[in-house]
A protein has these predicted regions:
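Short, acidic/small-residue loops that bind anionic groups at enzyme active sites
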Residues: 31-48, 52, 78-80
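N-terminal small/polar loop signature for handling phosphorylated ligands or for N-terminal nucleophile
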Residues: 1-25
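Phosphate-binding and adjacent anionic-ligand microenvironments
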Residues: 11, 49-198
Length: 199
């Protein structure tokens, strides 16, 4: 990131080893935010191809906001690429993915693909004529904290989640994967890990 501060590059792309997740670094060395990878490319896609969008429940609300800006429908899926793809097919989504930098663009294929994400991001950047940091500033500035709670065998997680649902029954609740509570200006998502004893 310090290399970016020298002013010789407009953007840096960071991918994982199997190139299915994408993060960016702005020209000033600040992380763009992997939660905003999908949001940004969806903005570009929706500008040129009206349609629905999908992300998993744990992703930023910003995709919903951008989708509604175009008068389209946002849908949430359970966490996991296969769940996102299933919901995308069911809702004829034109773009989808996850807040971990995963972009799924059906016009290319139904799989997370960082190279497709890079191409869409660069196209959007060129059309907007902005610096990367300026483009990032155009999206809702949601703060996301991802915390984990280690569980012990005697903890009844399902009972805890049921109690949370009951306490917040007057709020918008989605329980397709744990419990997500949507408030007017924030949200919280509690879910059990499928691979570790954590929430």
């Amino acid at each position: 990131m310090n290399l970016m501060k020298g002013g010789k590059a407009d953007v840096a792309f960071v991918v994982d080893p199997d190139v299915d997740r994408l993060a960016m670094i702005c020209e000033d060395g600040v992380m763009y935010g992997e939660e905003y990878t999908l949001v940004t490319v969806a903005d570009y896609v929706l500008k040129h191809t009206p349609g629905n969008t999908v992300s998993n429940l744990s992703s930023t609300r910003a995709l919903r906001d951008v989708t509604r800006k175009y008068g389209m429908e946002y849908n949430a899926s359970a966490v996991g690429e296969v769940n996102v793809v299933t919901k995308m097919k069911a809702t004829n989504a034109v773009i989808g993915g996850e807040g971990n930098g995963g972009v799924i663009y059906p016009a290319s294929h139904y799989g997370r693909d960082a190279l497709v994400g890079i191409a869409l991001f660069l196209s959007h950047l060129a059309h907007e004529g902005k610096k990367v940091s300026e483009l990032r500033a155009t999206y809702p500035p949601y703060f996301i904290a991802k915390n984990r709670v280690d569980l012990t065998p005697e903890i009844d997680v399902d009972a805890i989640l049921a109690k949370v649902k009951d306490i917040y029954k007057n709020e918008e609740i989605n329980d397709i994967d744990g419990v997500k509570i949507d408030f007017a200006d924030k949200w919280v998502h509690l879910r059990k890990s499928n691979t570790e004893p954590i929430i």
